Curated annotation (Swiss-Prot):
Functional summary from the UniProt entry: Shows antibacterial activity against representative Gram-negative and Gram-positive bacterial species, and a very high hemolytic activity.
UniProt keyword list: Amphibian defense peptide, Antibiotic, Antimicrobial, Cytolysis, Disulfide bond, Hemolysis, Secreted
A Pfam family matched in the record: Antimicrobial_1
Record protein name field: Brevinin-1Ea
Subcellular location: Secreted
Species whose genome carries this gene: Pelophylax lessonae (Pool frog)
Family: Belongs to the frog skin active peptide (FSAP) family. Brevinin subfamily.
């Protein structure tokens, strides 16, 4: 259960940072 959340977070966080900082 926890690893699935961690994998999803690791996938989503870069996208959020990308959209906030506009640095992809």
């Amino acid at each position: 259960f926890l690893p699935a959340i961690f994998r999803m977070a690791a996938k989503v966080v870069p996208t959020i940072i990308c959209s906030i900082t506009k640095k992809c």
